[in-house]
Curated annotation (Swiss-Prot):
One GO cellular component term noted in the UniProt record for this chain: chloroplast
Organism expressing this protein natively: Arabidopsis thaliana
PPR repeat extents: 116-146, 147-181, 183-217, 222-247, 248-282, 283-317, 318-348, 349-383, 384-418, 419-449, 450-484, 485-519, 520-550, 551-585
Source organism, top-level taxon: Eukaryota
A single GO molecular function term of this UniProt record: mRNA binding
Protein name: Pentatricopeptide repeat-containing protein At4g18520, chloroplastic
Compartment list: Plastid, Chloroplast
Transit pept. (range): 1-19
Keyword RNA-binding: yes
Entries under NCBIfam families matching the protein: PPR (TIGR00756)
InterPro entries reported in the protein's UniProt record: Pentatricopeptide_rpt (IPR002885), PPR_At4g14850-like_plant (IPR046960), TPR-like_helical_dom_sf (IPR011990)
């Protein structure tokens, strides 16, 4: 957020004459270097004093005014002929409380019939600085004339305190008044507004006006890069970044963060290296963005180098940097390093504790996650929704049903049981612990059931051997208009395979094809397993052969399908083909083929299959 600077009059304090029991400064104004110094004007205001020999400000007592009512008669406290707008603007900038701001405003209303615009601008900016947006808006609305600085100050004030809707409404009024876009700070405010509201088309129009007017400096161009990055327009962000004659840490961080968020981790790492080569030291936001890229790309070695840079260059290691480091190590499978970072952090908040609990739960260390959660509770830290989801997953992974039910009771007490993510995880927990009835009750009580909650129920029933219930839930899900995801298809096809429900399996195959889900390797593997389990090996191979991508699961499903249906030679051929394409044949596959091919000469079968594979190659 780029804050507006106040308009400062050129003042010079020349002497401080003593009048009665208080001091009153003599202010000299210099409007032009070619003119002579104007006559000194003595201003008599109580409590005015010189601060550090440089600026004038109000004494905290300021007993000359008896109230904050702007209509109150205080004419006895000052001489209106000796008060100047420039002096009042200077006092506004020196004031540290709204009480003084209102008194200065009252003085201006009493001394002058008309307010000049720049005094009103300073008054608005001072109110914004002290957080009184209501009074700032009253001043704004009461100004008979406004310029671009006036509108900018008010819009910037709303943005500063997160009131994007009010800022946007004010901008619409700005456009209706037909004021031209000429102020660089206004462009910065509008780009920040468009960034927060993801108003891409409006932001592009602002960009067009920037080009038309010819506005451009480092802050404006960085705001433009940040706007495109926040709207997910990576190409436009990079184009705007490349056109910058001068770059700063903010612009580098914006493009690195955009690359990381859009899944271009390698590109983000390359940009980060370029930033260092241009001698820019990253800040904590840059570090968090590049660590996210390392997490997604599993770039552990580079992540360690970033960690070393943070330590050596003494980059601010707040909870966000520490949490990003923990997340990077956890997603790269280095739980011990993740725990070391956690233990070395001097400050930990709910986000930090949630991150370490989620990391242990995700990597299968459920007991450790539960232990950390108990420590967190003893330290009286309030868990958020993500903490609850993580600890429920930890309970499910180790079968801690009792603790899960305790958490469920606490969830109901805190009135968060209708949260779809918490509800879906509760469904998964109860299914994992064999409590399908409790899982169904949770599902029924959810006000809106999304694909995650339905999939949790279907997967749970399928794993528990309740195939017919799983398929009924799939039917109900589709009737409610919820589109299945690849995990839903895989779970439902597993239920079809276990119950050998070929007709339903074919229907699911048709739906998956219609929704373009067949390209997913897990859906393809589940289809192979279903057709092979139902005895339709040729259809299983047709699915296998049409898969654009194969993994170990799909190879294994097809080989097992051949072997269990008595097609030993085909199984052996496929095993050799699998090995030739770089996949390791595990002992389970080999043992299955040996056990099912006992009625043929194995050496002859192996030799013929190998020869056949070499010929086809």
């Amino acid at each position: 957020m780029f804050s507006l600077s106040l308009i400062q009059p050129r003042l010079r304090i020349s002497e401080i004459p003593v009048t009665q029991s208080y001091k009153s400064p003599t202010i000299c104004y210099s409007s032009d270097s070619r003119t002579k110094r104007e006559e000194q004007r003595h201003v008599r205001l109580p409590g005015f004093r010189l601060v550090s020999g440089k600026r004038a400000s109000f004494d905290s007592g300021f007993s000359g005014f008896k109230g904050e009512n702007v209509n109150q008669d205080d004419s006895s406290s000052f001489d209106s002929e000796r008060v100047d707008y420039a002096l009042l603007a200077e006092w506004l900038q020196s004031s540290n409380g709204m009480r003084l701001i209102k008194r200065i405003h009252a003085m201006a209303l009493k001394c002058f019939d008309d307010q000049v615009i720049y005094f009103g601008n300073n008054l608005i900016s001072s109110c914004v600085r002290l957080g009184d947006l209501v009074y700032a808006r009253k001043v704004f609305d009461s100004m008979p004339e406004k310029n671009t600085v006036t509108w900018t100050a008010m819009i910037d004030g709303y943005l500063k305190y997160g009131l994007e809707d009010e800022a946007f409404a004010l901008f619409e009024d700005y456009v209706k008044h037909g004021i031209r876009f000429t102020n660089e700070r206004m462009f910065v405010c509008l780009l920040n507004l468009c960034s927060r509201r993801a108003e891409f088309e409006l932001g592009r129009q602002v960009h067009g006006n920037m080009v038309k007017v010819g506005v451009g400096n480092l802050i404006v161009e960085s705001s433009l890069v940040y706007f495109y990055a926040q709207c997910g327009e990576l190409t436009s962000a990079l184009r705007a970044f490349d056109m910058m004659e001068e770059k700063d840490v903010i612009s580098w961080t914006a493009v690195i963060s955009a690359c990381s968020r859009k899944g271009h981790g390698i590109k983000a790492i390359g940009m980060f290296i370029g930033m260092l080569n241009h001698w820019f030291l990253p800040n904590e936001f840059t570090v968090c963005s590049i660590l996210k890229a390392c997490s997604e790309e599993k770039a552990l070695r580079f992540g360690r180098q970033v960690h070393s840079l943070v330590v050596k260059r003494m980059i601010k290691t707040d909870v966000f940097v520490g949490t990003s480091l923990m997340d990077m190590y956890a997603k790269c499978g280095e739980i011990s390093d993740c725990r070391k970072v956690f233990d070395g952090m001097s400050n930990r908040n709910t986000v930090t504790w949630t991150s370490i609990i989620a990391a242990h739960a995700r990597e299968g260390f459920g007991e450790e996650a539960i232990s950390l959660f108990r420590i967190m509770k003893r330290r009286h830290l309030i868990a958020n929704n993500l903490t609850v989801v993580s600890i429920l997953r930890a309970c499910g992974s180790v079968g801690a049903l009792l603790l899960g039910k305790e958490l469920h009771a606490q969830i109901i007490k805190n009135s968060i049981e209708k949260n779809v993510y918490i509800g879906s995880t509760l469904v998964w927990l109860y299914c994992k612990c064999g409590e399908s009835r409790d899982a169904f009750n949770v599902l029924q009580q959810l006000p809106s059931r999304d694909v995650v909650s339905w999939t949790a129920m279907i997967s749970g029933c399928s794993s528990l051997g309740h195939e017919s219930e799983a398929l009924d839930f799939l039917k109900e899900m589709i009737q409610e208009g919820v589109e299945p995801n690849p995990f839903t298809y895989s779970s439902a096809l597993k239920a079809c395979a276990n119950s050998e429900s070929l007709l339903i399996g074919r229907s699911i195959h048709s739906i998956a094809k219609k929704n373009h889900a067949l390209s997913n390797v897990f859906v393809g593997s589940a289809l192979i397993h279903m057709y092979a389990k139902c005895g339709f090996v040729s259809e299983a191979f047709r699915v296998f052969d049409s898969m654009p991508e194969k993994n170990l699961v799909s190879w294994k499903a097809m080989i097992m399908g051949y072997a269990r249906n008595g097609f030993c030679r085909e199984a052996l051929k496929l095993m050799y083909r699998m090995e030739a394409e770089g996949f390791e044949v595990d002992d389970y596959i080999f043992a299955t083929i040996l056990s099912t091919c006992g009625d043929i000469e194995l050496d002859e079968a192996v030799e013929s299959s190998a020869t056949c594979y070499l010929e086809t190659s």
